[in-house]
Regions:
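Alpha/beta catalytic cores of group-transfer enzymes, especially the acyltransferase/condensing modules
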Residues: 1-122
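Acyltransferase/transacylase module recognition
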Residues: 87-183
Length: 183
């Protein structure tokens, strides 16, 4: 308790980083050019949010999560997953694995295992990942439940395809779009 995430909207990464100086907060998500999510203790995030609003951020809400995801505060549990993956045999994937923390496709099983295990302790580069998927001509993004935030963020990131939330659109719409795009 006492930890989580705060979204800073309306400021760039460099502006948010400058506001974080002297606090124990971390960049958690790079969702869009001017939507940066920070992680940390509630008081520290509140201070950064206050500074952000004073510098012209349009919003700086504390998100409804109690985990400081995608930052070094979760390095220890991530390391536990690294150790678990060391006991699993992985093969090269048949389909491209797009990393949210690098925004790049990974093919090597050991790099994919590291990415999956360490994801909770690394910054998510959502916008870069969406751009990378777009460059590879992916044309359908389906957000799994719950929610629809990623669907909206995908549309904002120069996405040229369809983007839907299963929560909001349902499986029938997803199947229809997949079939239409395959034809």
């Amino acid at each position: 308790h006492g930890y989580g995430l705060t979204a800073i909207m309306g400021l760039t990464l460099s502006q948010v980083e400058a506001l974080m100086v002297g606090t124990k907060t971390w960049i958690a998500n790079l969702n869009a050019e001017t939507q940066i999510v920070i992680a940390g203790a509630d008081e520290e995030m509140a201070e950064v949010a206050k500074r952000a609003l004073a510098k012209g951020a349009s919003k700086a809400p504390r998100l409804a999560v109690s985990v400081p995801s995608h930052c070094e505060l979760l390095a220890k549990p991530a390391q536990t997953l690294v150790e678990a993956f060391s006991r699993v045999t992985l093969s090269r994937p048949r389909y491209a694995y797009l990393s949210g923390s690098t925004g790049r496709v990974l093919w090597q099983p050991e790099r994919i295992a590291d990415d999956l295990a360490m994801n909770m302790a690394r910054t998510v580069r959502w916008q870069e990942a969406v751009i990378s998927a777009n460059e590879r001509e992916a044309r359908l993004a389906i957000e799994m439940p719950p929610g629809g935030v990623l669907t909206c963020l995908t549309r904002q990131a120069a996405w040229e395809g369809e983007s839907i939330s299963l929560d909001r659109s349902g499986i029938d719409v997803a199947v229809h779009l997949a079939q239409r795009l395959r034809a």
